[in-house]
């Protein structure tokens, strides 16, 4: 059974929010780097840097705080499709999140990509 790195990212960010931590340390893989880039671009994360300990790489992410309170800016993170329950959807059925102000991160299977 493999590790679920996407669930690890979401859980780390949620736990940091509950404990009012400012930074999150995530194991660095191609998928985690791509997801963290999206979260950075969309404003969930304020800053990211790559850190090395021995032969392992980590992403150290600084979470965005609100100006008035010391709480994380946005904390509603959910994983819909997971290894035990895959969700497949037509492009017309992708839901709007939080009335259109949230984001959906999705991946496409390379075989179904229109550039192949």
From Swiss-Prot:
Quote the gene name from the UniProt entry: rps8
**Ribonucleoprotein keyword on record:** yes
- Keyword terms of this UniProt record: Chloroplast, Plastid, Ribonucleoprotein, Ribosomal protein, RNA-binding, rRNA-binding
Describe the protein's quaternary organization and the partners it interacts with. Part of the 30S ribosomal subunit.
Where does this chain mainly localize? plastid
Q: InterPro entries attached here?
A: Ribosomal_uS8, Ribosomal_uS8_sf
Return the similarity comment: Belongs to the universal ribosomal protein uS8 family.
The record's listing under SUPFAM superfamilies reads: Ribosomal protein S8
- Per its UniProt entry, which superkingdom is the organism in? Eukaryota
The record's function comment reads: One of the primary rRNA binding proteins, it binds directly to 16S rRNA central domain where it helps coordinate assembly of the platform of the 30S subunit.
User: This chain belongs to which protein, by name?
Assistant: Small ribosomal subunit protein uS8c
């Amino acid at each position: 059974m493999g590790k679920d790195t996407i669930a690890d990212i979401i859980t780390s960010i949620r736990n940091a929010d509950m404990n009012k931590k400012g930074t999150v340390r995530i194991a660095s893989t191609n998928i985690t780097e791509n997801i963290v880039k999206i979260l950075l671009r969309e404003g969930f994360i304020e800053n990211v840097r790559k850190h090395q300990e021995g032969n392992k790489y980590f992403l150290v992410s600084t979470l965005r705080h609100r100006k008035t309170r010391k709480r994380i800016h946005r904390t509603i993170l959910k994983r819909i499709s997971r290894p035990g329950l895959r969700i497949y959807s037509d492009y017309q059925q992708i839901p709007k999140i939080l009335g259109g102000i949230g984001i959906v991160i999705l991946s496409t299977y390379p075989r179904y990509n229109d550039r192949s």
